[in-house]
Curated annotation (Swiss-Prot):
Name of protein: Glutamate--tRNA ligase
Database matches in CDD domains: GluRS_core (cd00808)
Pfam families hit by this protein: Anticodon_2, tRNA-synt_1c
Self-association and partners: Monomer.
GO biological process, one term: glutamyl-tRNA aminoacylation
């Protein structure tokens, strides 16, 4: 009997996302319920954005939640390497195999040619897609250009007529027309694979039997299925999970909700409660009880109990459930966990250098630095009263800084300050006009330790969370203001 093998394959390009944890949980439970194995693979082919720091944060977040893996980059295994960036030769081999079989081809089109192609198609009211012009090149010309070392990608051929039947474990058979599919790039000019080729090759070579992934990948499923057919491989069983949603039903995003697992750990949520809540996202226990452990979820796991309605990720409901878990702890364990959370040595070492020179007794630490240990802060609205800026301008400055911080890839003090300075300079203000607002929003106080140091230590999600709280305290941003300020954002360097 074939051993069930599932996997999670996150990209290490930022803080570990609750959506990653959600999909990891369901893959883990499915594998364990069937006596199988759960694998962790790292999709780090985006060399510009991928970092080992983000990779480690993924490991730490999943282990904090209680999700572990039998094979992965940090523990090894018989199917390694488990980082896609270390599997380049493997992808090159299989891409060339597709070319040799006539299922893929080199494409030498430049970015400018592709942009012009799309513009012409849009002008005609057509769906932008690759027009296949490289297929018209003779074998001799292709070889000449390859021999000359001309930059190129490898694209897959796709049918232009008919439909692809996608067998989904939740929805049954889903028909998707082939004319919606583009001639997907499989290998980029830098010699690294795109998601599609790497995904199929890795899942096959690692013996993955079932793939549970987010439903946002369902429209592109025909490309994956076609690749399995081209290679002559058995494809894994496919399951497209409903996406997590904000309370307004929009896709869960950091613009509306904190999305980092690290944020919830720092806020003092219990990992058991977090897993419990993620387990209730579109799934329920047979007896419908709300509070259950990871092992209880594994023991009772059945995909037939997954609901296709978009599950709502609501922090208030998560907080309520966390309260149930907290109150059920023996008081000794409650005290022990509180100590572990509040007096985390690594976190304390980040804070101590900024506090030590500002206090004369330990009792002065709490008033000065207590905001480091809080989730949100409750600043007095008077702290946002400004001699120079109107209330609307105060909100504008804070909103623009928040948006700039949302696009920040590397969370470092200098880059944080760069975001603030960019907004201030564009609005022809001084730093002294904006920094008191940041102090109030981030620390809840008129002054404290360096606010940019504090933002770096607190991290991106907690910083953005507090800025959003401050904006709500000041009345929020109207739809009209949001539209106008977003236009302004585009012109800020």
């Amino acid at each position: 009997m074939t051993t069930v093998r599932t996997r999670i394959a996150p990209s290490p390009t930022g803080d570990p996302h609750v959506g990653t944890a959600y999909i990891a949980l369901f893959n883990y439970c499915f594998a364990k319920q069937h006596g199988g194995e759960f694998i962790l693979r790292i999709e780090d082919t985006d060399q510009l954005r991928s970092t080992r720091e983000s990779e480690q944060q993924i490991f730490d977040a999943l282990r904090w939640l209680g999700i572990d893996w039998s094979e992965g980059p940090d523990v090894g295994g018989p199917h390694g390497p488990y980082r896609q960036s270390e599997r380049g030769d493997i992808y090159q081999k299989y891409a060339q195999q597709l070319v040799d079989m006539g299922h893929a081809f080199p494409c030498f089109c430049t970015a400018e040619e592709l942009d012009q192609m799309r513009a012409e198609q849009q002008a005609k009211g057509e769906t932008p897609r690759y027009d296949g012009r490289a297929l018209l090149l003779s074998k001799e010309e292709v070889q000449r250009r390859l021999d000359a070392g001309e930059p190129h990608v490898i694209r897959m051929k796709v049918p232009t007529e008919g439909v692809c039947v996608v067998p989904d474990m939740l929805r049954g058979e889903v028909e998707i027309p082939w004319d919606r599919m583009d001639m997907q790039v499989l290998m980029k000019t830098d010699g690294l694979p795109t998601y599609f080729l790497a995904n199929v090759v890795d899942d096959h070579l690692m013996g993955i039997t079932h793939v549970l992934r987010g439903e946002e990948w369902l429209p592109s499923a025909p490309k994956l299925i076609l690749l399995y057919e081209y290679f002559g491989w058995d494809k894994p069983q496919l399951c497209y999970m409903p996406l997590l949603r904000n309370p307004d039903k929009s896709k869960l995003s950091k613009r509306k909700n904190p999305t980092s697992v690290t944020f919830y750990e720092r806020m003092g949520f219990m990992p058991e409660a977090m897993l419990n809540y993620l387990g209730r996202m579109g799934w329920s226990m047979p007896d419908e009880r709300e509070k259950f452990s990871l092992q209880e979820m594994v023991d009772n796991f059945d995909l037939s109990r997954v609901s296709l309605g978009g599950p709502i990720f609501d922090i208030e409901k998560l907080s309520w459930l966390n309260g149930q878990w907290l109150r059920d702890l023996p008081v000794e364990e409650f005290a022990s966990r509180l100590k572990t959370w509040a007096l985390n040595p690594d976190y304390m070492m980040k804070i101590a250098p900024h506090v030590q020179g500002r206090v004369e007794t330990f009792s002065q630490v709490a008033p000065l630095a207590g905001f480091f240990f809080a989730g949100g802060v409750t600043p007095d609205v008077k702290l946002f009263e400004h001699k120079k800026l109107s209330p609307e301008q105060v909100r504008q400055v804070m909103q623009l800084i928040l948006w700039k911080l949302e696009s920040l890839r590397q969370w470092e003090k200098e880059r944080i300050m760069g975001c603030i300075q960019a907004v201030v300079e564009h609005l022809e203000l001084k730093l002294r006009d904006a920094m008191p607002l940041m102090f109030a929003a981030i620390t809840g106080q008129a002054n404290s330790v360096s606010v940019t140091d504090a933002m770096e230590i607190l991290g991106p999600d907690l910083t953005r969370f507090r800025l959003r709280q401050a904006l709500d305290l000041l009345g929020g941003v109207s739809k009209k203001e949001n539209k106008e300020w977003e236009k302004l954002l585009g012109s800020i360097a």
